[in-house]
Amino acid sequence: MQLNSTEISELIKKRIAQFNVVSEAQSTGTIVSVSDGIIRIHGLADVMQGEMIELPGNRYAIALNLERDSVGAVVMGPYADLAEGMTVKCTGRILEVPVGKGLLGRVVNTLGQPIDGKGEIDNDGFSPVEVIAPGVIDRQSVDQPVQTGYKAVDSMVPIGRGQRELIIGDRQTGKTSLVIDAIIAQRDSGIKCIYVAIGQKASTIANVVRKLEEHGALANTIVVVASASESAALQYLAPYSGCAMGEYFRDRGEDALIVYDDLSKQAVAYRQISLLLRRPPGREAFPGDVFYLHSRLLERAARVNAEYVERFTNGAVTGRTGSLTALPIIETQAGDVSAFVPTNVISITDGQIFLESSLFNSGIRPAVNPGISVSRVGSAAQTKVIKKLSGGIRTALAQYRELAAFAQFASDLDDATRKQLSHGQKVTELLKQKQFAPMPVSEQALVLFAAEFGYLDGVELERISSFESALLAYANSNHADFMKDLAKSGNFNDSIQQELKTIVENFKKNGAW
């Protein structure tokens, strides 16, 4: 068969028409230096700030410094085998982490990958780690409580849903113990919890996970781990990853509680990255934007209104507000709260719980200093019964501290002063609490009622603890229905006051403590 020129021409045209080329332009660059987890890249003209850069070996780096002829990026993961001359690519994506209810009960790393050996995670999608916080119009005022289960905290420095309450103190003052108990207290409250461990020993984190599991709180909690052995980049990013996981619940009309343990170590990791990127150091060698590092994180903890939730879920959830409550932890050096990072975080948050070494060492645990601990918005969210009964507690402690200072020098004290000192000592003793024993509202109310209305007057100081446990055992066995109802409602009225009075008076007549 012989084809003439016209047929050949038609055949070529047909083939050309059918020829399909899929071309994709990709920005590539070359590594020019590698040191301490920081790589400098020549090229990548189209890279964005914070963009993920694909490295050889299925690894990524994040672009942090965009300079005229090079890009400074921080490697997420091992970097020992990276070398000059290797080719890297832009991805066009910002770092995202998996989110959803499938993460509850799991231990994950900064990138949301499981590290607990329980298999793959069934996530509901991905969310960027850096998100702009909700605006003023999208927010609602804080008016619902988060019960920590600690008498000292719930009575004097109450925390509301959507609040940011700083927990600050020296090392070994019970900061982590306090937040772990707060997470355990949320078992039946419906509040989902996220615990972000930054720069801690792996053994400490394993211990925390075990305690949460023992007390039935792990199923309600996501644990995000960037341990001390992880790179500075992963320690710096861990809080943002945890926050993205918490926002999943907030934006769908649910309540979540996130703990950052601790932000001092995150600031140190960020300082390390910044100095290696040759950014100019400022006070205490921290970079100039260390305030923004924490403010953009903590502003994402908020209570959002029903319109925001409805808009976010495209009408799937209506009439429900969502909240993300943050409990950041800051570790001070020798009680110095005027250092750079502590003052920054104090100014960003809605109050602080100050834990003192001297109180902790003298056996007062939780070691809350009621004088300088404050909650700026929590009182509006406090349960009615606790609010009504805790009014005299702070005053009694303040007067006791003032008088105790004078009592050291005065030999003869009048009866009124002695009575005040005795009452202050008993209240201090009453506010002590063992770890892993969070108290429901009803039990706190009963104990505070006994303190407020003078029922501790006939009890010796060393018998306060046994008096309290016997009173609670008596109330829970003989008035179980009332205690359950009070724990559920948290209301306070004349009939509830009368019932509390009856319980305490009958118990004191009994005298079995």
From Swiss-Prot:
CDD domains listed in its UniProt record: ATP-synt_F1_alpha_C, ATP-synt_F1_alpha_N, F1-ATPase_alpha_CD
EC number: 7.1.2.2
Family assignment from sequence similarity: Belongs to the ATPase alpha/beta chains family.
Sorted UniProt keywords: ATP synthesis, ATP-binding, Cell inner membrane, Cell membrane, CF(1), Hydrogen ion transport, Ion transport, Membrane, Nucleotide-binding, Translocase, Transport
PROSITE patterns: ATPASE_ALPHA_BETA (PS00152)
Main enzyme class: translocase
Membrane-topology descriptor: Peripheral membrane protein
The keyword Transcription regulation belongs to this UniProt entry's keyword annotation: no
Catalysis performed (reactions): ATP + H2O + 4 H(+)(in) = ADP + phosphate + 5 H(+)(out)
Function: Produces ATP from ADP in the presence of a proton gradient across the membrane. The alpha chain is a regulatory subunit.
Site (Required for activity) location in chain: 373
Annotated Gene3D superfamilies: 2.40.30.20, ATP synthase alpha/beta chain, C-terminal domain, P-loop containing nucleotide triphosphate hydrolases
Gene Ontology, cellular component aspect: plasma membrane; proton-transporting ATP synthase complex
Disulfide bonds: none
Name of one Pfam family that matches: ATP-synt_ab_C
Keyword Nucleotidyltransferase among UniProt keywords: no
NCBIfam families: atpA (TIGR00962), PRK13343.1 (NF009884)
InterPro entries noted in UniProt: ATP_synth_asu-like_sf (IPR023366), ATP_synth_asu_C (IPR000793), ATP_synth_asu_C_sf (IPR038376), ATP_synth_F1_a_nt-bd_dom (IPR033732), ATP_synth_F1_asu (IPR005294), ATPase_a/bsu_AS (IPR020003), ATPase_F1/V1/A1_a/bsu_N (IPR004100), ATPase_F1/V1/A1_a/bsu_N_sf (IPR036121)
Name of this protein: ATP synthase subunit alpha
GO molecular function, one term: ATP binding
Residue sites binding ATP per the record: 169-176
Subunit organization: F-type ATPases have 2 components, CF(1) - the catalytic core - and CF(0) - the membrane proton channel. CF(1) has five subunits: alpha(3), beta(3), gamma(1), delta(1), epsilon(1). CF(0) has three main subunits: a(1), b(2) and c(9-12). The alpha and beta chains form an alternating ring which encloses part of the gamma chain. CF(1) is attached to CF(0) by a central stalk formed by the gamma and epsilon chains, while a peripheral stalk is formed by the delta and b chains.
Subcellular location: Cell inner membrane
